[in-house]
């Protein structure tokens, strides 16, 4: 059987480069927007997209490494690709193990956030609001402005300053840290600042919250 070589003209190569250049310009623009504005204090929607993109990087990395190992350029590239594939697989499995442990402790889907393995649990209005905590610290500041609560750069929704919880928790895969309110300062109408400081830690689940039907209806 005779083999035929397919060659491309200069115009076809230039057209192909232009098409891919446009595609990559759009991809890099989207990545820039996600990285620039993907913070919970700016846009929760973009932040969720950022988490989804980060989550997809693991399987994409494994797929590329496995493909390079199956169809190698040479023996050296095959060995390196196999090592990279095994490393990516081990790191992905470790991520899932830690995320499942955190989910069993908190019951929140934020446990699978690839950016952080710390969750801040704040009991408000008869339920517990859970948000990822990017920075691990021994103290957390709560700011209530006109009845809206914000802690560690995360929005927690409507909250009466006078009914702030006396204790919040920070959950990790291997420990639950309790933080107690040590100082509170009111200013304005239903506004103020409260400081929570770590006072104990242990290997237990997040404490259950007793439902307050009246407060739950007010928040609905």
Curated annotation (Swiss-Prot):
Main location: virion
Coiled-coil stretches noted in the UniProt entry, renumbered to this chain: none
Record's subcellular location: Virion membrane; Host Golgi apparatus membrane
Function: Component of the viral envelope that plays a central role in virus morphogenesis and assembly via its interactions with other viral proteins.
Name the UniProt record assigns to this protein: Membrane protein
Chain ranges on the Intravirion side, renumbered to this chain: 41-50, 101-220
GO MF terms, alphabetically ordered: structural constituent of virion
A Pfam family recorded for this sequence: CoV_M
Subunit structure: Homomultimer. Interacts with envelope E protein in the budding compartment of the host cell, which is located between endoplasmic reticulum and the Golgi complex. Forms a complex with HE and S proteins. Interacts with nucleocapsid N protein. This interaction probably participates in RNA packaging into the virus.
Keyword line: Glycoprotein, Host Golgi apparatus, Host membrane, Host-virus interaction, Membrane, Transmembrane, Transmembrane helix, Viral envelope protein, Viral immunoevasion, Viral matrix protein, Virion
Lineage: Viruses, Riboviria, Orthornavirae, Pisuviricota, Pisoniviricetes
PROSITE patterns: COV_M
GTP-binding found in the keyword field: no
Cellular component annotations (GO), alphabetically ordered: host cell Golgi membrane; membrane; viral envelope; virion membrane
Transmembrane segments: 20-40, 51-71, 80-100
Family matches, as InterPro entries: M_CoV, M_MERS-like-CoV
Native species: Bat coronavirus HKU5 (BtCoV)
Membrane topology (UniProt): Multi-pass membrane protein
Virion surface side: 2-19, 72-79
Membrane listed as a keyword: yes
Family membership noted in the UniProt record: Belongs to the betacoronaviruses M protein family.
